[in-house]
């Protein structure tokens, strides 16, 4: 199967995050950051930019091509907004409820909440929260619960933070912070089918499952007694990515620097359903397909991007998961960000957004 490169853009800063808007197949955001040379303050060295893009409809594209003799493929998606920051963007997630909300976590500890205006086609800031962090600590990842009223964030000191969001998204309050990992907590994620359960992965090579009810009842005055996870699995290398299946309960995908993808059944945690062969690089992002339940896509650092799927004759058997299609396209650097567009009605017009780091490359792949 031959991939189609819909479009390629080279951005101002190094790119690390791509997220499609859940309610329009053609709208997506890309997060970037830059380390400024010569600055001695670790956190102050980063600056960032958030881009909002729109993929042009086919008729609009044909009109543009006819009106421009020197057209090039950069016209196939266009920048409609950018926002500059004095801090690097390290992760973003859309809230999947109908409020059109995007959460953005940045290196210095800012947690920004934006609302997408579908008429004006722009992001509007609803709230900006300064997370209390020491100067050498970075915010690394975030995730929303399914209800859209809580967020979790992970940090480079191994901590995880739980945050409550008001109904109008004007205020974010930290409810709990706990020591989850001995080193960087690279990733955190909610269980979308049980909002009292969250997952985390860290550079201490551990995948952990936490019960929020237990955590909220944990006495922080018990100095030296950390909260206890429901489950801990030690991996060969650092755990870098986790994504809960959006429609199948108890199914979790976990990626690691060891280059292998593991699928876990939460009802049977003795061993994973499958541990894949090497995907060619550390698995930095995993995204389940929003509608085709037997597929996911990965960004594998030095190994490019891969779609994995189960046997088409037995799509529910995740032990058959294997690479269906791979993509490098124009990308010459570390594959960090990836996401599916939300086209429920026509999978032939399904887009995958991909970004890579040092080459500052963003592309749209049609599998």
Swiss-Prot record:
One of its GO terms (cellular component) is cytoplasm. WD repeats lie at residues 84-124, 132-173, 180-220, 234-274. It is an enzyme of class 3 (hydrolase). It comes from the Eukaryota. Pathway: Protein modification; peptidyl-diphthamide biosynthesis. It comes from Dictyostelium discoideum (Social amoeba). PROSITE patterns: WD_REPEATS_REGION. Catalyzes the demethylation of diphthine methyl ester to form diphthine, an intermediate diphthamide biosynthesis, a post-translational modification of histidine which occurs in translation elongation factor 2 (efbA). One of its GO terms (biological process) is protein histidyl modification to diphthamide. Gene3D superfamilies: YVTN repeat-like/Quinoprotein amine dehydrogenase. GO terms for molecular function: diphthine methylesterase activity. Belongs to the DPH7 family. InterPro entries: Diphthine_MTase, WD40/YVTN_repeat-like_dom_sf, WD40_repeat_dom_sf, WD40_rpt. Pfam families: WD40 (PF00400). Keywords: Hydrolase, Repeat, WD repeat. SUPFAM superfamilies: WD40 repeat-like. This is Diphthine methyltransferase homolog.
């Amino acid at each position: 199967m031959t991939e189609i490169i819909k479009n390629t853009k080279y951005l101002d800063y190094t790119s690390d995050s791509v997220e499609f808007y859940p309610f329009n197949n053609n709208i997506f955001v890309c997060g970037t950051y830059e380390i400024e040379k010569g600055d001695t303050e670790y956190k102050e060295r980063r600056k960032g930019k958030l881009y909002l893009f729109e993929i042009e409809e086919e008729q609009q594209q044909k009109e543009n091509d006819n009106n421009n003799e020197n057209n090039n493929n950069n016209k196939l998606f266009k920048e409609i907004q950018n926002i500059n920051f004095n801090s690097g963007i390290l992760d973003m997630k859309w809230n999947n409820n109908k409020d059109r909300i995007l959460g953005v976590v940045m290196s210095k500890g800012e947690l920004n909440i934006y609302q997408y205006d579908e008429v004006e086609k722009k992001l509007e800031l609803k709230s900006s929260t300064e997370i209390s962090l020491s100067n050498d600590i970075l915010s690394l990842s975030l995730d929303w619960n399914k209800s859209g009223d809580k967020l979790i964030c992970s940090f480079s000191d191994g901590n995880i933070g739980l945050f409550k969001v008001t109904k109008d998204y004007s205020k974010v309050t930290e409810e709990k912070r706990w020591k989850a990992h001995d080193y960087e907590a690279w990733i955190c994620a909610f269980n979308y089918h049980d909002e009292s359960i969250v997952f985390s992965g860290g550079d201490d090579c551990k995948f952990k499952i936490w019960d929020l009810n237990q955590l909220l009842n944990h006495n922080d005055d018990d100095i030296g007694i950390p909260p206890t996870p429901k489950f801990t699995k030690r991996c060969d290398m650092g755990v870098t990515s986790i994504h809960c299946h959006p429609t199948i309960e108890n199914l979790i995908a976990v990626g690691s620097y060891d280059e292998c993808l593991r699928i876990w059944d939460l009802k049977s945690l003795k061993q994973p359903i499958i541990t894949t062969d090497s995907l060619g690089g550390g698995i930095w992002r995993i995204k389940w397909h929003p509608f085709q339940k037997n597929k996911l896509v990965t960004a594998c650092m030095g190994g490019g991007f891969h779609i994995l799927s189960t046997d088409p004759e037995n799509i529910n058997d995740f032990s058959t998961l294997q690479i269906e299609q791979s993509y490098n396209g124009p990308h010459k650097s570390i594959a960090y960000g990836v996401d599916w567009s939300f086209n429920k009605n026509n999978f032939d017009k399904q887009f995958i957004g991909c970004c890579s780091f040092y080459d500052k490359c963003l592309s749209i792949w049609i599998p």
